[in-house]
UniProtKB/Swiss-Prot annotation:
Cell cycle is among the record's keywords: no
Coiled-coil region: none
GO CC annotations, alphabetized: glutamyl-tRNA(Gln) amidotransferase complex
Identification of the protein by name: Glutamyl-tRNA(Gln) amidotransferase subunit A
SUPFAM superfamilies, per database record: Amidase signature (AS) enzymes
Gene name as annotated: gatA
One Pfam family this sequence matches: Amidase
EC number: 6.3.5.7
Keyword terms, alphabetized: ATP-binding, Ligase, Nucleotide-binding, Protein biosynthesis
């Protein structure tokens, strides 16, 4: 199936009309993955038998008008648990973990008739910005196989961008959906914190993690979010807030909309060529009848240190459960219980995960809690207030998703601080719990640039409205990796 030229709506129409069956679609998708993934390395495991079984069931039941995802093959990031399909979080610690239940988002997708064709590669336990931290393989950027696909949802982004699947799920803790989407020239959406259930998401940082979507088209993302959003009694952090039809405002003009462009998002560290693409996008919005005004988010500069203290502290707590006793990797030839703990965790976790566990444990220790973790929480509040002040007068905030285009594989992996700074523009959104998306905004040196759109809490609909208006004005999706 040529996913480069297809939307979920078009697939739905073909399935409804009988031009193609779900079984045929799954067979073509699996064949395409087997052909393309030798170069991209986006997948860790295929769910071939399960996908074929589900496709046959969908074909037998038929597809209703109100089931746009029925029979549609999608990919799932490997930190979302899938019953009967090995789920590793790209870690040696979980190399043979076969879940006995489905995450809430998987249950919702299954009920909607969507088909999981496989699990995608990622940075181990979602800790990374390049997918180089996977214990199993290094995924390549769909546009240039010498460059990173971003992270931590790099496998999902590369799979969609390379045309292996039409859509995928990812998770976003500090930019892990939006940054790979920007690097691969696709649409990545991080919903409001609490909009989508985290039940069944292998935890990294519980106050920051959020499941979201990676697609080629804005409306496809809205349709996916329509299915996976909503309150879940098994996740106390999900909001009991009505879920609108996220496609409802797509196609509406943006005349009169007030858009903010923070000066900090185009400042030091941002490639001038990337900044120029964002300024060009701002001009397009003005031509469409919106106003774009420079504003300030003054505490942006403190976002990265605040985030890495909070996220690492929560990770050190969450990952205590991987102890070599209950499940997961266990070291061999251990001498005693302490040896089980120490060696299983030392051998089972990769370098970046161990680095963050150590940082988090230090930040939570009695002598340093106030100086680090408590202060990081206070900075988080200041960053949230910055956004609240801007949203008193504006409908949306825009800026670049990343400071640069995708960098070379191996270029930053040995320099954690440089790697962490790549998330400077996405992290503030997670700290504030806001919804945001990255959409294609052109190219620099042949590599995609992402435009980030940040909305008010639970106002994903406005993001989709503006993103779709921008998408309609541009033909970036017509440009395909490898000239296919």
């Amino acid at each position: 199936m040529d996913y480069f030229k297809t939307s979920i709506d078009q697939l739905h129409e073909q399935l409804r009309s009988g031009k193609v069956t779900s079984s045929q679609l799954v067979d073509e998708t699996l064949a395409g993955i087997n052909q393309l993934d030798a170069e991209v390395d986006a997948f860790l495991a295929l769910n071939a038998d399960g996908a074929k079984e589900k496709a046959a069931a969908v074909d037998a039941a038929g597809i209703a008008d109100d089931q746009p995802l029925a029979g549609v093959p999608i990919a799932i990031k490997d930190n979302i648990v899938t019953k009967g399909v090995v789920t590793t979080a790209a870690s040696k610690m979980l190399a043979n973990f076969n879940p006995i239940y489905d995450a809430t988002v998987m249950q919702k997708l299954d009920a909607a008739g969507a088909i999981n064709v496989g699990k995608t590669n990622m940075d181990e336990f979602a800790m990374g910005s390049s997918t180089e931290n996977s214990a199993f393989k290094t995924t390549k950027n769909a546009w240039d196989h010498t460059r990173v696909p971003g992270g931590s949802s790099g496998g999902s982004a590369a799979a969609v961008a390379a045309g292996e699947v039409i859509a995928a799920l990812g998770s976003d803790t500090g930019g892990s959906i939006r940054q790979p989407a920007a690097f691969n020239g696709i649409v990545g959406v991080k919903p409001t914190y609490g909009r989508v259930s985290r039940w069944g998401l292998i935890a990294f940082s519980s106050s920051l993690d959020q499941i979201g979507t990676l697609t080629r088209h804005v409306k496809d993302a809205a349709q996916l979010l329509n299915v996976i959003a909503g309150h879940d009694e098994r996740d106390s952090t999900t909001a009991d807030t009505p879920v609108p039809d996220f496609t409802a405002k797509i196609g509406q003009d943006i005349k009169g909309m007030k858009i903010a462009l923070p000066k900090e998002y185009l400042g030091k560290g941002v490639d001038p060529a990337v900044a120029d693409k964002i300024k060009a996008a701002a001009k397009q919005f003005e031509d469409m009848g919106a106003t774009v005004t420079e504003v300030s988010l003054p505490h942006t500069q403190y976002a990265v240190p605040s985030y890495y203290i909070i996220a690492s502290s929560e990770a050190s707590s969450n990952l205590q459960r991987f102890d070599g006793i209950r499940y997961g990797f266990r070291a061999k030839d251990v001498k005693n219980i302490e040896d089980v703990y120490v060696r299983s965790r030392s051998e089972g976790f990769g370098p970046e995960v161990k680095r963050r566990i150590m940082l988090g444990t230090f930040s939570l220790s009695a002598g340093f809690y106030d100086a680090y973790f408590k202060k990081a929480g206070q900075v988080r509040t200041l960053i949230t207030r910055d956004f609240e002040d801007v949203f008193k007068d504006y409908d949306l905030i825009i800026g670049p998703t990343t400071p640069t285009v995708a960098f070379k594989i191996g270029e930053k992996v040995t320099d954690p601080v440089t790697m962490y700074m790549n998330d400077i523009l996405t992290i503030p959104v997670n700290l504030a719990g806001l919804p945001a998306a990255s959409v294609p905004a052109g190219f620099v040196d042949g590599m995609p640039v992402g435009l980030q759109l940040i909305g008010k809490h639970f106002d994903e609909s406005t993001i989709f409205q503006v993103a779709a208006a921008f998408e309609a004005q541009n033909d970036y999706l017509a440009q395909i990796p490898g000239g296919k």
